[in-house]
Amino acid sequence: VELTAEEKAAVLALWDKVKEDEVGGEALGRLLVVYPWTQRFFDSFGDLSTPAAVMGNAKVKAHGKKVLHSFGDGVHHLDNLKGTFAALSELHCDKLHVDPENFRLLGNVLVVVLAKHFGKQFTPELQAAYQKVVAGVANALAHKYH
């Protein structure tokens, strides 16, 4: 990911304030509500029949936290995203057969959730930096598909 030193510092500073459980659950939940076809990868999660059911689902929240923890690993290894996400890329490609477009969608949803949680702190400049990061993570996760 091509970030300036200032962008990297800003991304890391905000990430240190992110509550992975809250933001992760909300981001994954929103992905499943806004893009309902993504629910097919989560058959074992129980009731996903309504937006309220999705957003209140304990398995969605738990997996969202796990996803965000992995994303945080990427934030702390911006110079080696492909290496950081190699195993997850292989898992999602070979075993789970997840459409790599879903990584881009989740990244964009994550930016929305960060904006919601951080309000004015999430400046347009910070959003631009995070868009670069989520694009880089999505690309790294899609790496094994190429």
Swiss-Prot record:
Modified residues (N-acetylvaline): V1
SUPFAM superfamilies: Globin-like
Tissue: Red blood cells.
Residue intervals of the Globin domain: 2-146
Residues found modified as Phosphoserine: S44
Domain of life: Eukaryota
Family annotation (InterPro entries): Globin, Globin-like_sf, Globin/Proto, Hemoglobin_b, Hemoglobin_oxygen_transport
Coiled-coil region: none
Subunit note: Heterotetramer of two alpha chains and two beta chains.
Function, as annotated: Involved in oxygen transport from the lung to the various peripheral tissues.
The protein's name: Hemoglobin subunit beta
Species this protein is from: Ceratotherium simum (White rhinoceros)
Phylogenetic lineage: Eukaryota, Metazoa, Chordata, Craniata, Vertebrata
